[in-house]
């Protein structure tokens, strides 16, 4: 064989999955059945040194979601381009430290990501539960068509109290109570989103949100570790 007869893949699994899916499919090896554990088991955190192939499992789950008749719907949230400096402004209180400081904001961002999947990928436009939440999000200034960077910017504005008078008025009209600060506003929306999910029938489909790039982020600025550790508290059933 000559060199031209060889077909080379990529060192980066995500890039190979996108550009050379046939090579990725043949080359991927999972002798310890990690993919099945991540999809169906209780394991949710994949730890390893940089370069050992953690992102390959993310790419594999994404590839499975694209197979015909797949019940998996996957969405990746890559932390390498996450707006940490902006997100840091959404901490609930300067006097609060540790994981609780950003948990409410993370709850909101992750649940909003799930609702984007329901609306954009599963097209659940006829669900009353989903539509009620979409209306609530719209009044708060969040669009399901925006990238998550725009959501973080909007969340910061909610923290500052910008453009929320209409939301507060509509919320009070519908639920006979009005939130008075950022934590209350985010918490009530989050609570409604969770209740909406409980009333939503997925027809055995499984929604998976993959957070990638954690190891890269923790090398940098001090507040990022505090922000990231808040994700360990997230749990939705």
Model-derived features with residue positions:
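A short, basic N-terminal segment
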Residues: 1-44, 66-70, 80
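Conserved catalytic network of the ASCE P-loop NTPase/AAA+ motor domain
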Residues: 37-38, 199-203, 237
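Short, glycine/acidic-rich beta->alpha junctions
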Residues: 38, 189, 228-232
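Generic beta-sheet signal
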Residues: 42-46, 205-211
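P-loop NTPase nucleotide-binding core
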Residues: 49, 56-207, 217-220
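Substrate-engagement module of ASCE P-loop NTPases
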Residues: 193-198, 230-237
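Walker B catalytic acidic pair
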Residues: 212-216
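Short, flexible/disordered intra-domain loops and linkers
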Residues: 221-227
